[in-house]
């Protein structure tokens, strides 16, 4: 990609990078190869007491942080008092491994959940109740010595337990069902945001974050809600690292969580500026004013209404006035916001051809506050399809 950008700058025209399937596997940062040996121990009444894992990871020519993530997820998804993970990275003459869908999380989930199913079977315990008994909770110590922030594995399991598909699922001939827990620590980063309202009532939001998965739509929603503006009047402007506010990389499941508090703070500052301008305009107390669909009005007096655009025009055109209506925000959150999930599937297998057909699929995700449910559903559907292959 950097070479493609360099050629585009040199040629002063659009350049497209097109890879064959083989080239994509060789040079597209594929998921690292991994071998995990896992042993667990539990008491007869179903309490995990030990975990021991050995991990060998081939990350190609460069070192990577994926092993630390893998070790954390293996040793911390369930509350296991005695856990050890030995991790070795093997560097080989291959392309660097990359973050293919939450780096190392699918590997950890596959080996750990397979082991949990085997353990429940050996103990003759219900696999869901076994997981409920042992799932990590908020405040539990992770294998790296830190504590889990808010984590809702048990809530996801309880939702599965109560779901009609799970309760009513019968096993017809050549069918089977199963479920697994998934957990991702997510990340967090310092972030900033700036807002400016123009004379036509447009609100410009200046950010340093690149759009990923439609997050700029969610950012505009936050501003629109704070200022009671129509979504189409919000303009999200992505800036470069030289001129834009500090921002996290667009990855690692952290962008919205890290940036939205800064956006809210910036838009709240614009809100306070507008209320102050309207207070002077009406000679009224700020407490008696409210924002309403692009205007500021006196509560209970519909005739006393002024558009935000007019307030901005007056502020910017009056000598010695308030000047541009702007706001800035910044934040640095103290902890991650882990995302837990439980997925259940029922399949039918053709015994003659080996063809596997999914009959029902249930995805239960702790998404926190669903700022844009449609975008979230799209991400979940995409992950399910990718997981099914």
Model-derived regions, located:
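Cofactor-binding beta-sheet edge motifs in enzyme active sites
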Residues: 1-155, 162, 167-389
């Amino acid at each position: 990609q950097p070479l493609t950008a360099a050629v585009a700058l040199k040629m002063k025209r659009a350049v497209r990078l097109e890879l064959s399937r083989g080239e994509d596997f060789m040079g597209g940062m594929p998921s690292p190869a991994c071998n995990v040996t896992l042993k667990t121990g539990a008491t007869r009444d179903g309490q995990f007491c030990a975990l021991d894992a050995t991990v060998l990871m081939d990350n190609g020519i460069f070192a990577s942080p994926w092993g630390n993530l893998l070790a954390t997820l293996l040793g911390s998804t369930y509350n296991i008092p005695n856990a050890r993970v030995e991790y070795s990275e093997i560097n080989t003459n291959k392309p660097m491994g990359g973050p293919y869908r939450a780096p190392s999380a699918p590997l950890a989930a596959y080996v750990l959940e397979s082991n949990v199913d085997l353990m429940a079977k050996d103990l003759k315990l219900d696999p869901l109740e076994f997981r409920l008994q042992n799932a990590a909770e908020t405040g539990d110590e992770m294998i790296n010595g830190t504590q889990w922030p808010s984590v809702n594995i048990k809530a996801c399991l309880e939702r599965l337990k109560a779901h009609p598909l799970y309760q009513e699922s019968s096993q017809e001939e050549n069918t089977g069902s199963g479920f697994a827990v998934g957990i991702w620590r997510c990340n967090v980063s310092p972030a900033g945001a700036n807002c400016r309202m123009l004379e036509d009532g447009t609100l410009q939001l200046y950010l340093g974050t690149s759009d990923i998965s439609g997050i700029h739509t969610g950012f505009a929603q936050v501003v629109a809600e704070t200022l009671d503006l129509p979504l189409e009047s919000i303009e999200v402007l992505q800036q470069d690292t030289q001129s834009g506010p500090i921002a996290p990389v667009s990855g690692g499941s952290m962008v919205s969580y890290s940036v939205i508090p800064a956006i809210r703070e910036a838009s709240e500052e614009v809100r306070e500026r507008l209320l102050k301008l309207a207070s002077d305009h009406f000679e009224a107390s700020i407490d008696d004013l409210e924002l309403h669909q692009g205007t500021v009005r006196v509560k209970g007096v519909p005739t006393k209404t002024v558009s935000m655009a007019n307030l901005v025009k007056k502020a910017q055109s009056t000598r010695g006035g308030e000047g541009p209506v702007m706001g800035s925000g910044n934040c640095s959150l103290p902890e991650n916001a882990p995302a837990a999930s439980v997925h259940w599937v029922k399949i039918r297998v053709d015994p003659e051809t080996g063809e596997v057909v999914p009959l029902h699929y249930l995805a239960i995700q702790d998404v926190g506050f669903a700022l844009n449910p449609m975008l979230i559903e799209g991400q979940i559907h995409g992950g399910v399809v990718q997981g099914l292959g």
